[in-house]
C-alpha cells in the first residue's frame, strides 16, 4: 500500500511535465504531417493535436498522420531526412521572421553555398570572414588606420595648443611687469600742472553754481524751510521790498499745506 501511494505521488509530480512533453510532440507531429501533405487543408492541425492528446473521441485525423509519418520514415534515406529537417527549419524560420527571410534569405543561402565551412576553415575563422566579407573588412581596417592618423593629428593639435597657452601665459607675465613698471600710467593720463591750475580757478569761480551770494537773512530761513519745494517748481524769487509781506504769509501757508510743503 505504501508503494502504491508512493507511485501515485510520483505520477502526480511528474504528470504536468509528461503532459507538456506529450503536447509538444503531438503538435510537432501534426505540424509535420500538415507540411508534408500535398494539400495542407486536408489535415486540420488543431484536431490532430487534440486527438493525439486524447481530448477528442475520434482518432481519424491522428491515425492518418501516424501512417503518413511511418511511410515517410521508411521511404526516405538518412540524407533525405536530414535535408527534410533543414527544409522544415527554413520553413519555421520563414514563419517566424516573415518578410526578413523573404528579402534576405536567398542572399544568406547563396553565401553559404559559395563559401561552405570546412574543418580547417572553422579553426581559422578570420580567413573565412575575410573571404565572405572581404571588402567590408578592408574598409574597417582602413577606418582603423584613419582613426590612428586622426589620433596622431589630435595629439599634434593638443601640443600646439599647449605651446600657444604657454606663449599666452608668458605674454600675461610681460603685461604684469609693464604694469608694475609704469604703474597708473596705463590706467589714465596724468593732467599737466597748467590744466590743474585752470580747473582750480574754475572751481573757485563757478563751483557753487547753485549758491547765491548776498542773499537776505529772511531768504536763508525761507530756503531752509522750503528749499526743496523751490528747487522743484522754480518759483520766482521775491524782491527785498516784498520780503516782509512774504515772510508774514509763510506761517499761514505752513498751517494750510503742512506736510505737503516738506520734502
Curated annotation (Swiss-Prot):
Principal place of residence: cytoplasm
Propeptide: 192-203, 213-223
Location relative to the cell: Cytoplasmic vesicle, Secretory vesicle, Chromaffin granule lumen; Secreted
Disulfide bonds: 26-48, 30-52, 33-65
Modified positions (Phosphoserine) in chain numbering: 247
GO cellular component, one term: axon terminus
GO terms of molecular function: opioid peptide activity
Signal sequence residues: 1-24
Marked site (Cleavage) residue numbers: 108-110, 130-131, 210-212, 214-215
UniProt PTM: Proenkephalin-A is cleaved by CTSL to generate Met-enkephalin.
PROSITE patterns referenced in this protein's UniProt entry, alphabetically: OPIOIDS_PRECURSOR
Coiled coil: none
Keyword line: Antibiotic, Antimicrobial, Cleavage on pair of basic residues, Cytoplasmic vesicle, Disulfide bond, Endorphin, Neuropeptide, Opioid peptide, Phosphoprotein, Secreted, Signal
Expression (tissue specificity): Secreted by neuroendocrine chromaffin cells through cromaffin granules.
Protein's GO biological process: aggressive behavior; behavioral fear response; chemical synaptic transmission; defense response to bacterium; G protein-coupled opioid receptor signaling pathway; locomotory behavior; neuropeptide signaling pathway; sensory perception
Family: Belongs to the opioid neuropeptide precursor family.
PANTHER family: PROENKEPHALIN (PTHR11438), PROENKEPHALIN-A (PTHR11438:SF3)
Protein name per UniProt: Proenkephalin-A
Species of provenance: Bos taurus
Chain's gene name: PENK
Amino acid at each position: 500500500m505504501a508503494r502504491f501511494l508512493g507511485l501515485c505521488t510520483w505520477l502526480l509530480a511528474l504528470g504536468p511535465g509528461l503532459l507538456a512533453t506529450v503536447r509538444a510532440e503531438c503538435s510537432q507531429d501534426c505540424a509535420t504531417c500538415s507540411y508534408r501533405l500535398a494539400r495542407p487543408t486536408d489535415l486540420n492541425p488543431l484536431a490532430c493535436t487534440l486527438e493525439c492528446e486524447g481530448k477528442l473521441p475520434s482518432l481519424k485525423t491522428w491515425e492518418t498522420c501516424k501512417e503518413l509519418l511511418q511511410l515517410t520514415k521508411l521511404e526516405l534515406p538518412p540524407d533525405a531526412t536530414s535535408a527534410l529537417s533543414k527544409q522544415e527549419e527554413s520553413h519555421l524560420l520563414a514563419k517566424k521572421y516573415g518578410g526578413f527571410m523573404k528579402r534576405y534569405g536567398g542572399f544568406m543561402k547563396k553565401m553559404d553555398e559559395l563559401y561552405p565551412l570546412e574543418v580547417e576553415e572553422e579553426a581559422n575563422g578570420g580567413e573565412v570572414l575575410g573571404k565572405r566579407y572581404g571588402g567590408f573588412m578592408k574598409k574597417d581596417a582602413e577606418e582603423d588606420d584613419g582613426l590612428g592618423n586622426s589620433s596622431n593629428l589630435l595629439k599634434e593639435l593638443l601640443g600646439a595648443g599647449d605651446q600657444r597657452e604657454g606663449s599666452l601665459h608668458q605674454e600675461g607675465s610681460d603685461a604684469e611687469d609693464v604694469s608694475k613698471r609704469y604703474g597708473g600710467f596705463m590706467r589714465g593720463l596724468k593732467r599737466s600742472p597748467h590744466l590743474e591750475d585752470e580747473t582750480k580757478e574754475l572751481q573757485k569761480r563757478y563751483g557753487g553754481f547753485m549758491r547765491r551770494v548776498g542773499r537776505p537773512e529772511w531768504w536763508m530761513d525761507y530756503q531752509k524751510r522750503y528749499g526743496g519745494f523751490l528747487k522743484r517748481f522754480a518759483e520766482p524769487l521775491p524782491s527785498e521790498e516784498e520780503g516782509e509781506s512774504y515772510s508774514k504769509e509763510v506761517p499761514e501757508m505752513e498751517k494750510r499745506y503742512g506736510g505737503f510743503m516738506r520734502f
